[in-house]
Amino acid sequence: MEFTAQQIADYLHGSVEGNPKVRLHDFAKIEEGRSGCLSFLANAKYEHYLYQTQSDAVLVNQDFEPRESVKTTLIRVPNAYTALAQLMQLVDSMKPQRKGVDSTAFVHPSVILPDDCYVGAFAYVSEGASLGTGCSLYPHVYVGSGVSVGEGTILYPHVTVYDGCSIGSRCVIHSGAVIGADGFGFAPNAEGYSKIPQLGNVIIEDDVEIGANTCIDRAVMDSTIIHRGVKLDNLVQIAHNCSVGSHTVFAAQVGMAGSSHVGEWCQFGGQVGLSGHIKVGDRVSLGGQTGLLSNVKSGSTLLGSPGMPLRDMLRASVIFPKLPDMSLRIEQLEKEISELKEICKNNKH
């Protein structure tokens, strides 16, 4: 990467305030800026770093008004955070693409391998698998029998995709993720538990990103489905027969129990937990560690365990620290009431 501030502004449909010819070759956080770096300011909490940063240019919102003099070059754009994402996507697309099959990889003879695919060292592609154009399988990836991988999809090292699963186009699956392992299905009997065969699969639609060590279990029958545009963080667990609606995002350690369904455009914070067989509507926001035991209507914002409306949870959180003292006061009041009753009783006699 090496661009002038003016080239970046032109690409982002922005304007330059300062030196349009300053050359930029790397990104840096505004508080850790260095010469030759581009930073961004999208959160007012970080504004004080703008006046001391060593970065040679900073992306700011079009309407940003500095409170002090600024030494660095400003690139004004409609939305600094979105602009940064656009620019980083451009830089990422300029990286050289790996191609070819490593000599230590195994690709079954039945697999039709597009010329521009990459299959890394010790990767294994099973019989009947289908690989789309431009896909990349990094070292030690396992692709099971009958699996389809769409065009431009990237499977990073040690990703495992079990038999019969389907991965869409332009997906990114990070290291250690497991797609299509057996769901947790056991029938109790007199001797313990009998395993229920998990005969379904997992379908991951286009433009999905899945974090490291995330697990998505195959359905008992039919499919566990991750719809288009979903983004899953690391260490997410999605059980059998679940579905996640388009463009929903999960932070780390979200867990969905079996046969639960989440709508479109939802946002779940870290360690959210869903019990089985519930439905969450569209555009639902759940704060970190929220626990759901029942269905949730579209447009809801919940927090706590069990989850409750945000306003109620905030009010309750003010009361929680006072509960021990309140309990003591109630006990004292109960004692006093009991004594008063006894006095009244004696007075009647």
UniProtKB/Swiss-Prot annotation:
* Assembly and binders: Homotrimer.
NCBIfam families according to UniProt: lipid_A_lpxD (TIGR01853), PRK00892.1 (NF002060)
Pathway assigned in UniProt: Bacterial outer membrane biogenesis; LPS lipid A biosynthesis
Q: Which keywords accompany this UniProt record? A: Acyltransferase, Lipid A biosynthesis, Lipid biosynthesis, Lipid metabolism, Repeat, Transferase
Which is an annotated Pfam family here?
A: Hexapep
Q: What is its EC number?
A: 2.3.1.191
Its function, per the record, reads:
Catalyzes the N-acylation of UDP-3-O-acylglucosamine using 3-hydroxyacyl-ACP as the acyl donor. Is involved in the biosynthesis of lipid A, a phosphorylated glycolipid that anchors the lipopolysaccharide to the outer membrane of the cell.
Tell me the gene name: lpxD
Tell me what reaction this enzyme catalyses: a UDP-3-O-[(3R)-3-hydroxyacyl]-alpha-D-glucosamine + a (3R)-hydroxyacyl-[ACP] = a UDP-2-N,3-O-bis[(3R)-3-hydroxyacyl]-alpha-D-glucosamine + holo-[ACP] + H(+)
A molecular-function term among this protein's GO annotations: N-acyltransferase activity
- Full protein name: UDP-3-O-acylglucosamine N-acyltransferase
**InterPro entries in the cross-refs:** Hexapep (IPR001451), LpxD (IPR007691), Trimer_LpxA-like_sf (IPR011004), UDP_GlcNAc_AcTrfase_non-rep (IPR020573)
Q: Which family does it belong to?
A: Belongs to the transferase hexapeptide repeat family. LpxD subfamily.
Question: What GO cellular component term, any one, is given?
Answer: membrane
One GO BP annotation is:
lipid A biosynthetic process
Kindly indicate where the leader peptide sits in this chain.
none
The catalytic residues are 240
